[in-house]
A protein has these predicted regions:
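Sec-dependent N-terminal signal peptides
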Residues: 4-13
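Ser/Thr-rich, low-complexity intrinsically disordered terminal regions
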Residues: 14-141
Length: 141
């Protein structure tokens, strides 16, 4: 009976788990929506595109550096860390709106790609772009 139960558990784990997803690294961020409240380094539309953050150390050290930098900021929460990918929530001071900021570290090109987008509303008065310029400047100094 124990043997049968073990087999059922193992089979159900196989049906609910996609191991290729678990062990693969993210290589691309989602595109920005048509609304003006999003910027990304991988965006094809010029008005939404920003240049990536550059790093010289290994991607592991670059991830640690960015994590330390963002940990010192208020209203910033790490939501997910998976391989070369980080996802943060930034809560705005006024209105307590949440913006999603994602980082993707490319070891080969020594670039940190990012996407910063407001969860709600249509416009952001340029907040996402200003935030990412500030983060890039602080990281690269």
């Amino acid at each position: 009976m124990k043997y049968l139960f073990s087999i059922i558990i193992l089979l159900s784990m196989g049906w609910t788990t996609d191991s290729s997803f678990i062990f693969s690294e993210k290589t691309k961020l989602d595109p920005c929506p048509n609304s003006p409240n999003c910027v990304s380094t991988q965006e094809t539309r010029k008005r939404k595109r920003m240049r990536p953050i550059l790093f010289t150390e290994s991607s592991d050290l670059a991830i640690e550096k960015l994590e330390r930098m963002l940990a010192s900021k208020s209203r910033v929460t790490l939501v997910e860390k998976k391989g070369n990918y980080l996802h943060y929530e930034f809560k705005t001071k006024i209105g307590k709106f949440i913006d999603d900021v994602e980082f993707l570290f490319d070891e080969e090109t020594k670039q940190i790609h990012f996407r910063s987008a407001s969860r709600k509303g249509y416009g952001d008065f340029g907040k996402n772009k200003r935030r990412m310029k500030k983060i890039r400047k602080e990281y690269e100094k």
